[in-house]
Amino acid sequence: MKTIIALSYIFCLVFAQDLPGNDNNSTATLCLGHHAVPNGTLVKTITNDQIEVTNATELVQSSSTGKICNNPHRILDGINCTLIDALLGDPHCDGFQNEKWDLFVERSKAFSNCYPYDVPDYASLRSLVASSGTLEFINEGFNWTGVTQNGGSSACKRGPDSGFFSRLNWLYKSGSTYPVQNVTMPNNDNSDKLYIWGVHHPSTDKEQTNLYVQASGKVTVSTKRSQQTIIPNVGSRPWVRGLSSRISIYWTIVKPGDILVINSNGNLIAPRGYFKMRTGKSSIMRSDAPIGTCSSECITPNGSIPNDKPFQNVNKITYGACPKYVKQNTLKLATGMRNVPEKQTRGIFGAIAGFIENGWEGMIDGWYGFRHQNSEGTGQAADLKSTQAAIDQINGKLNRVIEKTNEKFHQIEKEFSEVEGRIQDLEKYVEDTKIDLWSYNAELLVALENQHTIDLTDSEMNKLFEKTRRQLRENAEDMGNGCFKIYHKCDNACIGSIRNGTYDHDVYRDEALNNRFQIKGVELKSGYKDWILWISFAISCFLLCVVLLGFIMWACQKGNIRCNICI
């Protein structure tokens, strides 16, 4: 009896060696996969607010260098002078005479140190001179007759002596007369001329007659295109530098071929010449950031910023080729594929699961690739062609976004007088609306680009899979998880031919068909076929043993077999 049971057990073991799936020498497994990282980056697409990708680039510049770079733009530091003070010739701003700039930087510590003045349209004059980019001044010989020139004031010291604005000529009575002044100055040049002039407003009637004789003066400045008539307003004003009188500053632009006419019977602050007007992209900015030796195309009041990103939220005010201002603190552009972190699976094929299962964190030499298992072991290799195809289409994406958004001009500060408050409110509303619109457009643009990138990288993966499937044809079976079961012996050279596209399926066709039919004849189409086969085998062995035991007991009862039990 022992002999029979032993023979039965040996028979079962021999049978077990012939179960399908135990001979891996005649088959191989090839899986396609893509790159993955342990911790990806979340980006936004049209269809998903948060989708993880292997790599992404930040598109919003959110910090400055903290200093204004002096290259490539020519920066003129106003230090203690405003641009208008430098224009008029305030004594402490004499160092700015005939200066040029791309960007004039006004400081919060700037102050006036001459006769108190106001400019009725200060912002327009400031912007006009700033955009010209120069304080180049040409003296002209105006013929003022019967009056005293070069008036000065103790409120405008030039050294120890009383002085005045260097670009203006204060005219007052000569003796006891102030004759009517009527002078002309033609523009025979080929460029516009900017004339700065003013009207003096005495604080009392006595001051008025002491300086100009007449109780009421009048100043008229005209060209062929315009005329301005100003009547002085005599009256006391708040005291500034020991004076309660004021000067109002005006300007006139004389075109080539036009003529300047000045008529006055008193209170005239006359021009000494003209400023050359130039056209360009010069500007002005209020900032307390220091000026440093560095290079940057984009300048904000906070300091220079790089312009290698399409958007910035450092400051609305900019100069140069700058990223577009948006409200968002961050906008990320996907520069990698959809990230599916690798799962630590177990099992015969768990270690080389395909792209449908999860990504491959170990693949660092490409975005797409192959893993295989054959009689020579396991291996992995990247597919450089599909990787390069995806990279080529993504590489130019950032530059294209920058080209669409970077401003090649500056966003200047806008100022309005108090009486223009409603205009200022409207301007602010328009600017805020523009920023809202650009912020929305930026988010939409990035979401569209991210959607395209993910669709593109998914498409390249599918192209590689289809290319492999067309090569293998009936020699392999698609296992449905990104892997192929190859029904012929496929060594490393064979695997390499599949990867590089030189695989000849006809060479292996007969072997593959033969192996497929042999395996399929006994293979169960279930996800648990191996378990079912082993359970069936165990039950069969158990039943065989029961039958043998029953036969032995029956034979013992009939006397054909004698069984002695010794204790």
From Swiss-Prot:
Primary localisation category: virion
Residues in the Extracellular compartment per record: 17-531
Glycosylation sites noted in the Swiss-Prot or TrEMBL record: N24, N25, N39, N55, N80, N143, N182, N302, N500
Signal peptide span: 1-16
Oligomeric and partner information: Homotrimer of disulfide-linked HA1-HA2.
More info: Major glycoprotein, comprises over 80% of the envelope proteins present in virus particle. The extent of infection into host organism is determined by HA. Influenza viruses bud from the apical surface of polarized epithelial cells (e.g. bronchial epithelial cells) into lumen of lungs and are therefore usually pneumotropic. The reason is that HA is cleaved by tryptase clara which is restricted to lungs. However, HAs of H5 and H7 pantropic avian viruses subtypes can be cleaved by furin and subtilisin-type enzymes, allowing the virus to grow in other organs than lungs.
Name of this protein: Hemagglutinin
